[in-house]
C-alpha cells in the first residue's frame, strides 16, 4: 500500500514538473 502511494505521488510530482516546464517553455 505504501509503495503504491509513493508511486502515485512520484507520478503526480513528475506530471506537475513537466506541466510547469512546458508552460514556461511555451510562455
UniProtKB/Swiss-Prot annotation:
Cysteines joined through disulfide linkages: none
Transmembrane segments: none
Record key words, sorted: Amino-acid biosynthesis, Leader peptide, Threonine biosynthesis
Top-level taxon in the UniProt lineage: Bacteria
Family annotation (InterPro entries): Thr_lead_pept
Keyword Transport carried by entry: no
Keyword Amino-acid biosynthesis belongs to the record: yes
Single biological process term from Gene Ontology: transcriptional attenuation by ribosome
Protein role: This protein is involved in control of the biosynthesis of threonine.
Recorded family membership: Belongs to the thr operon leader peptide family.
Protein name, as recorded: thr operon leader peptide
Species in which this protein is naturally found: Escherichia coli O157:H7
Lineage: Bacteria, Pseudomonadati, Pseudomonadota, Gammaproteobacteria, Enterobacterales
Encoding gene, per UniProt annotation: thrL
